[in-house]
């Protein structure tokens, strides 16, 4: 306490955090009563000056940044560019979403920083500026929405809407922006109603699991502890420093600076000592913790440390378990309500950027980089190791150090401008991501075409089989534009045959299609001769069998007419079928095909001179009459005709299958042969050379002038072909650029006819819903993409994550790490000790300790990300209850758990030695319950004490229980039944014949007894009962004081009080109702204490 009194008060700006530190120092130095008077005077001073200032809010005080317009224009241009790239098929929808989200988030953060600068420059005494930045009312995010822009909004499912709100609340919202803002309004209402209940239920579970934890004794005499380090963010900035974490803790070991002892064991750490220790030994400060406390059902005073609101050692009888549960659960309710004020604004983190210091040329070594594709779809360089980028320009030279795994957004020797982003630095800690899926919908109505092969999968959905395709590689999916027309079932069934009678006002004519079976066309390929030269040609002979179907493409769709009779009640219709020739000839041209050789001669083989044949094919003329059908319908007078539009789906040209009624004519092919002779020589690469075609020309020696030619460049031009798919923006000529994407249908001399199409870039792992050549409408789901995105830092995400950690789900990283560490440590220790029976005991202890510290840090990080700090001791108490059980396994092998059999404990022989700490639990408690089942949960301390006694130790493995399961596995079935599953707990306890000793707070409350906390604690009641005896005997025995002073013992007043109380009880021959738990639960006489102290 003397450390706080020596502090000097500095003249500084008293914001919210400074006033908080001032109050802490006032309470520690002057006490609570004096602090209350000082704070009253401070409050009066604040109201007095705020009244004189006359701070009030008006619309004129909401000053917007003058840079907002061009910043938003620049962001819109970037968003439009990414949208165009997505339409071209260069990037897929997820990359476009990432780029848009990060662009607008960067713009919003830049406006937020400019808002602070503009307030300081334009009006430093602006009421909005003073209230928000002093912490009196509002925060920076709320002021940013007033004068900056609202930015990106999350929908109720937590997904980010890619359309940002560019307006602020002062300018007013448009209709679209107002509808998007309603998501945030509804989100606040849902959080207030539902998430508050979740936070309250979380508080109930936390209190339930630790309600029996009370400070019962002073010291458990443990030498173990934990090392607390700074908790850092993903960017590396410290959230919570080590100095703040060790304040109020007790040292587990003495600390030395050289040969000088700067702190002794069991010494509490104040603010000044914490500042010194963090500087002298920042990585090796071992402090005592409730996790390492040796007591079974409670925590000792030194392992807990300072009280939360006292600034001194915690009192005996303090119900620290209830305080811990309330301290963790209560911020959840506050943070839930905070969502209402921010309105669901996205506040994700992005990568750190390196920018160019000035204009110049950037140089770096490319052999340490490899090309890759970043999350925005851009081609970048990935650093394989640490890299140095040197920027040279304007007579200056500057070097930038880029760490490994970073992405370079520029090329070597590229000109960069000042403040241009040249690299993205990967965060030191990976950001929290989640896998989500995004459905991509069709912008066009048409036909789906895959450019890559896909794997067919089956998925049961709503009782039907949904066939989807899984894309293993990167590719494109095209939608060819077209129109879709559908007819109802009544129109399809309104076709009548000859001699039928019909009624009035119904459709009497319709068109139908005939389906016929087809025969395959057999191709017979005959290899006539092989020419080893530039090309290899084959002869093909096709024989078309009789009855082969010819597929005719109907280019012009027919119209459907509906005839409605109005004058005659009944009418007889006569239908005649008149054959006609629809397409008289079938012309099939077989061109010269270029095929690859399946076998080659060996290298350096001379082929003999032979006669080679080169064939050229003429056109094949086939005379094949086809038979079609035509319906004739006589129409009576007074008939009205209505057009129904087109029939069927015309996404692509319809195919009509027609049957040949007459055999085809034979095919006549004229064959032409050309012959030549040549020698050829094959090298090992398979290229052919004409030996006789080489000539050597010898020229006279002449003098030539060396002239340089500059301005040379290569010109590339795409040669369009029919059926080719071309993206928007492609140059088909040197100056002609396509304005739309499509498929080339026909090519003329001065124009190209395209079929309008829309490309979609497919990433690996994308699911394709329609089959190839399927027809879809506009707005149908085309593909589903799986990707990772940053979690929004909001309590909707934060509170379930904290609950997930506290409930220790099976997929939790801490649970998986505990199992892996246990297996690894068991195998390592077994190799050293060569004893599996003892190695798992050490591995269980170490792996459990590592998981406990990791879980404490993870829970602390969740709350720190919301701006709330929880004292580590509260989380440690909850984690201690979660990890206090172990699971018994069979066959002495903790790595192999079986499901059957019994574990019987051999009883120790009579008269065998028992350890001293075993006396705390009656031996009959173990002997009477010597049978256990595999996978049964037993307390870790009980399992350790059992293994101290028996010859063959029982094998067990560590487990991490959630707070719900830990509440249902306690020593009190009364507490379990009052929490959950009352009937199950009571029936199971009755079968097991369990006994409840009613030691916890909840059990005593249920039976109306005094709770064992505070004045109801046995230690405190003993002090009150024997207080008068203590006061009388204290004045008589001054020998005790002299003895203590002569030895210079550093005993606390509480320890002296307890020792002397034990002496008073012994001298009056009165026995207390309970032990005082001093020196292994024994009451020592005064002479014994003196002998111990002398030794």
Swiss-Prot record:
Keywords assigned by UniProt, alphabetized: Chloroplast, DNA-directed RNA polymerase, Metal-binding, Nucleotidyltransferase, Plastid, Transcription, Transferase, Zinc
Q: Quote the EC number.
A: 2.7.7.6
Reaction(s) catalysed by this chain, per the record, are: RNA(n) + a ribonucleoside 5'-triphosphate = RNA(n+1) + diphosphate
Q: Which InterPro entries match?
A: DNA-dir_RpoC2_beta_pp (IPR012756), RNA_pol_Rpb1_3_sf (IPR042102), RNA_pol_Rpb1_4 (IPR007083), RNA_pol_Rpb1_5 (IPR007081), Rpb1_funnel_sf (IPR038120)
Chief location bin:
plastid
Q: Which domain of life is it from?
A: Eukaryota
Tell me where it resides: Plastid, Chloroplast
> Can you tell me which residues bind Zn(2+)?
220, 293, 300, 303
> A GO molecular function for this record?
DNA binding
Keyword Lipid biosynthesis appears in the UniProt entry: no
Cellular compartments per GO CC: chloroplast; DNA-directed RNA polymerase complex; mitochondrion
Q: By its UniProt entry, which Pfam families does this protein fall under?
A: RNA_pol_Rpb1_4 (PF05000), RNA_pol_Rpb1_5 (PF04998)
What remark does the entry make about the cofactor? Binds 1 Zn(2+) ion per subunit.
Question: Which cofactor does the UniProt annotation name?
Answer: Zn(2+)
The record, for CDD domains, names: RNAP_beta'_C
Q: An example of a Gene Ontology BP annotation on this entry?
A: DNA-templated transcription
Q: Which HAMAP family match?
A: RNApol_bact_RpoC2 (MF_01324)
Subunit composition?
Answer: In plastids the minimal PEP RNA polymerase catalytic core is composed of four subunits: alpha, beta, beta', and beta''. When a (nuclear-encoded) sigma factor is associated with the core the holoenzyme is formed, which can initiate transcription.
Q: What does this protein do?
A: DNA-dependent RNA polymerase catalyzes the transcription of DNA into RNA using the four ribonucleoside triphosphates as substrates.
| NCBIfam families the record matches | rpoC2_cyan
Belongs to which family?
Answer: Belongs to the RNA polymerase beta' chain family. RpoC2 subfamily.
Q: What is this protein called?
A: DNA-directed RNA polymerase subunit beta''
Gene assigned in the entry: rpoC2
């Amino acid at each position: 306490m003397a450390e706080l009194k020596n502090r000097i008060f500095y003249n500084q700006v008293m914001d919210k955090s400074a006033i908080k530190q001032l109050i802490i120092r006032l309470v520690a130095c002057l006490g609570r009563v004096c602090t209350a008077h000082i704070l009253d005077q401070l409050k009066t001073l604040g109201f007095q000056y705020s009244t004189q200032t006359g701070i009030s809010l008006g619309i004129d005080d909401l000053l917007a940044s003058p840079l907002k317009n061009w910043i938003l224009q620049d962001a819109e241009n970037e968003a439009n560019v990414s949208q165009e790239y997505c339409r071209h098929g260069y990037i897929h929808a997820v990359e476009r979403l990432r780029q848009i989200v990060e662009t607008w988030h960067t713009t919003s953060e830049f406006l937020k920083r400019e808002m602070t600068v503009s307030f300081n420059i334009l009006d430093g005494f602006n009421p909005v500026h003073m209230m928000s930045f002093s912490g009196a009312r509002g925060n920076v995010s709320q002021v940013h929405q007033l004068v900056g822009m609202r930015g990106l909004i999350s929908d109720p499912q937590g997904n980010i809407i890619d359309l940002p709100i560019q307006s602020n609340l002062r300018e007013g919202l448009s209709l679209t922006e107002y509808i998007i803002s309603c998501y945030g309004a509804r989100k606040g209402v849902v959080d207030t109603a539902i998430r508050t209940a979740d936070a309250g239920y979380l508080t109930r579970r936390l209190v339930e699991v630790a309600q029996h934890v009370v400070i019962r004794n002073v010291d458990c005499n443990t030498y173990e502890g934990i090392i607390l380090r700074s908790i850092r963010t993903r960017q590396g900035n410290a959230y919570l420093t080590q100095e703040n974490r060790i304040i109020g803790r007790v040292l587990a070991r003495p600390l030395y600076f050289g040969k000088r002892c700067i702190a002794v064991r069991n010494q509490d750490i104040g603010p000044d000592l914490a500042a010194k220790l963090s500087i002298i030994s920042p990585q090796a400060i071992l402090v005592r913790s409730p996790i390492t406390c040796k007591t079974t059902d409670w925590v000792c005073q030194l392992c807990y440390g300072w009280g939360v609101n006292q600034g001194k050692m915690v009192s005996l009888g303090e119900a620290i378990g209830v305080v811990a549960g309330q301290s963790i659960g209560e911020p959840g309710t506050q943070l839930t309500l905070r969502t209402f004020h921010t309105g669901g604004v996205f506040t994700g983190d992005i990568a750190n950027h390196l920018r160019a210091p000035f204009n110049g040329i950037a140089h770096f070594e490319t052999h340490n980089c490899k090309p890759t594709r970043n999350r925005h779809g851009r081609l970048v360089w990935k650093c394989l190791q640490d890299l140095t980028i040197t920027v040279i320009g304007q007579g200056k030279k500057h070097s930038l150090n880029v760490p490994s795994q970073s992405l370079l957004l520029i090329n070597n020797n590229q000109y960069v401008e000042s403040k241009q982003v040249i690299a993205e630095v990967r965060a030191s800690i990976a950001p929290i991501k989640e896998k989500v899926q995004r459905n991509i919908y069709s912008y066009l109505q048409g036909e789906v075409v895959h450019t890559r092969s896909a794997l067919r999968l089956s998925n049961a959905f709503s009782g039907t089989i949904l066939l989807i395709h899984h894309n293993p590689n990167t590719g494109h999916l095209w939608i060819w534009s077209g129109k879709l027309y559908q007819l109802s079932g009544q129109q399809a069934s309104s076709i009548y045959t000859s001699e039928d009678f019909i009624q009035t006002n119904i459709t009497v004519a319709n068109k139908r299609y005939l389906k016929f079976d087809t025969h395959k066309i057999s191709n017979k390929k005959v290899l006539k001769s092989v020419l080893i030269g530039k090309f290899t040609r084959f002869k093909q002979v096709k024989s078309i069998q009789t009855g082969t179907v010819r597929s005719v493409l109907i280019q012009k769709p027919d119209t459907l007419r509906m005839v409605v009779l109005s004058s005659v009640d009944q009418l007889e219709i006569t239908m005649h079928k008149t054959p006609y020739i629809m397409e008289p000839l079938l012309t099939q041209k077989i061109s010269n095909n270029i095929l690859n050789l399946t076998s080659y001669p060996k290298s350096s083989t001379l082929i003999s001179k032979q006669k080679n044949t080169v064939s050229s094919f003429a056109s094949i003329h086939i005379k094949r009459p086809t038979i079609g059908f035509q319906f004739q319908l006589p129409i009576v007078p007074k008939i009205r005709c209505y057009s129904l539009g087109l029939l069927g789906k015309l996404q692509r040209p319809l195919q009509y299958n027609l049957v040949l009624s007459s055999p085809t004519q034979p095919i006549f092919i004229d064959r032409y042969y050309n012959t030549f002779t040549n020698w050829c020589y094959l090298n090992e690469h398979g290229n052919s050379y004409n030996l006789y075609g080489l000539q050597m020309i010898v020229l006279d020696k002449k003098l030539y002038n060396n002239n340089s030619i500059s301005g040379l460049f290569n010109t590339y031009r795409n040669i369009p072909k029919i059926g080719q798919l071309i993206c928007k923006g492609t140059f088909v000529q040197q100056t002609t650029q396509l304005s739309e994407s499509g498929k080339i249908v026909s090519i003329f001399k001065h124009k190209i006819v395209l079929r309008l199409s829309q490309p979609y870039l497919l990433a690996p792992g994308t699911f394709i819903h329609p089959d190839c050549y399927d027809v879809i409408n506009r707005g149908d789901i085309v593909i589903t993409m799986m990707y990772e995105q940053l979690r929004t830092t909001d309590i909707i995400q934060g509170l379930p994550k904290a609950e997930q950690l506290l409930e220790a789900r099976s997929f939790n990283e801490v649970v998986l790490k505990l199992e892996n560490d246990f297996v690894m440590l068991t195998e390592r220790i077994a190799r050293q000790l060569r004893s599996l029976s003892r190695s798992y005991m050490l591995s269980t202890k170490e792996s459990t300790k590592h998981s406990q510290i990791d879980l404490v840090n993870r829970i602390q990080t969740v709350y720190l990300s919301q701006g709330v700090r929880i004292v580590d001791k509260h989380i440690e108490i909850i984690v201690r209850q979660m990890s206090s059980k172990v699971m018994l396994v069979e066959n002495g092998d903790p790595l192999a758990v079986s499901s059957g059999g019994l574990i019987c404990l051999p009883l120790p022989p009579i008269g065998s030695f028992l350890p001293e700490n075993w006396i705390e639990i009656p031996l009959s408690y173990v002997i009477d319950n010597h049978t256990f089942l595999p996978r049964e949960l037993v307390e870790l301390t009980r399992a350790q004490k059992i293994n101290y006694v028996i010859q063959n130790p029982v094998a067990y493995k560590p487990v991490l229980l959630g707070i719900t399961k830990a509440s249902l596995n306690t020593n009190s079935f009364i507490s379990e039944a009052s929490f959950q599953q009352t009937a199950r707990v009571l029936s199971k306890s009755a079968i097991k014949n369990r006994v409840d000793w009613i030691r916890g707070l909840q059990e005593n409350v249920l039976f109306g007894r005094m709770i064992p906390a505070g004045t109801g604690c046995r230690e405190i009641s003993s002090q009150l009962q024997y207080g008068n005896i203590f006061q009388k005997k204290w004045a008589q025995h001054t020998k005790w004081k002299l003895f203590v002073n002569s030895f210079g013992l550093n005993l606390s007043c509480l320890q002296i009080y307890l020792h002397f109380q034990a002496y008073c009880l012994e001298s009056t021959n009165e026995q207390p109702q309970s032990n005082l738990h001093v020196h292994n639960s024994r009451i020592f006489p005064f002479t014994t204490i003196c002998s111990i102290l002398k030794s």
